[in-house]
Amino acid sequence: MKVIDIYNSLKDSGKKGFSIEILPPVKGTSLDDIEKSLLPIIPLNPQFINITFHAPVRKFINENNVTTLVESHPRTATAAVAGALKRRTGIEVVPHLASAYYTKLQLEDFVIDFSYE
């Protein structure tokens, strides 16, 4: 079900709903801890899980008197995490990203990556 359908269903029924927001795991860590933290919440029937895709961390590195701007992403695999959580929990997942930090082409790549259904 799409999020707009969830909103419309709640609106039409007059019911209230809620969502959960999580961060993807830090590079090199497992999704298991996130899943464990969601276990007590899933029976409460959240309408969707929102996964934050953060802006890159930018820092200057000076090597051999040459300064270079380097971008890194301490939290990666947002699309993979979104797909895995949706399959494992059955709850709709909404990945979102801070688009102000990316080019149009990078955003296009992210949208393609987020097409996990």
Residue ranges of each PLM-predicted region?
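Acidic (Asp/Glu)-rich catalytic clusters
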Residues: N8-S13, L38-N45, A80-G90, V111-E117
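N-terminal glycine-rich phosphate/pyrophosphate-binding loops that anchor nucleotide-derived ligands
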Residues: M1-I6, T29-I34, P40, V57-K59
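Glycine-rich, proline-tolerant flexible connector loops at the mouths of alpha/beta enzymes
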Residues: P25-G28, L44-T78
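Alpha-helix-loop-beta-strand connector modules within alpha/beta enzyme cores
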Residues: K2, E63-P95
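N-terminal amphipathic alpha-helix/helix-capping segment at the start of soluble metabolic enzymes
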Residues: M1-I20, K27, K86
